[in-house]
Amino acid sequence: MFMGEYQHNIDIKGRLIVPAKFRELLGDNFVITRGLDKCLFAYPQEEWKKLEEKLQTLPLTKKDARSFTRFFFSGASECELDKQGRINIPSNLLQYADLEKETVIIGVSSRIEIWSKSEWDDVFNEAEESFADLAENMIGFDI
C-alpha cells in the first residue's frame, strides 16, 4: 500500500525521483496518466489492469463514460524507473499537471499521485480546513 508525502524536484530533462519506499511497490514498469484535480496518477501494472477491467465494463452508450475513458486512457503512458530511481514524465502530462520543478508525491492506497507543490498546498489546505466535514460524509462508507 502506498502512503506518505514526499517532495522532489523535476530536473531539466523532465525526470523525477520516485521515493525509495514507492519503487518496489510500483515495480519496474508502471502506468502514469492524468489524474483528477490536476495531478497525475501512477499505478503498478497489476492495479492498472484491475482498473482497466472495471472501466471496460462502462457502457459505450453513455457519453460521460466515453468521455472519461477517452480522457483517462489517452493520457496514459507506460514508464519505467532508471537506475537512479527516476521516471521521465511525458511532456503532455507535465503540462496537464502544471509540473515545472517542485513536486509533491503522495501515496494514496493503490496508487501514487504527483502534484505541483503549489497545487498540492492549495488542495491540502482546503482539505485540512474541512477534514472533519469530509470525515462525517464518509460515515456511510463504514470507515
From Swiss-Prot:
The keyword Transcription applies. The keyword Repeat applies. One of its GO terms (cellular component) is cytoplasm. Keywords: Cytoplasm, DNA-binding, Repeat, Transcription, Transcription regulation. It comes from the Bacteria. GO terms for biological process: negative regulation of DNA-templated transcription initiation. One of its GO terms (molecular function) is transcription cis-regulatory region binding. It is found in: Cytoplasm, Nucleoid. Residues 5-47, 76-119 form the SpoVT-AbrB domain. InterPro entries: MraZ, MraZ_C, MraZ_dom, MraZ_N, MraZ_sf, SpoVT-AbrB_dom, SpoVT-AbrB_sf. Belongs to the MraZ family. HAMAP family: MraZ. Forms oligomers. This is Transcriptional regulator MraZ. It comes from Listeria monocytogenes serovar 1/2a (strain ATCC BAA-679 / EGD-e). The gene is mraZ.
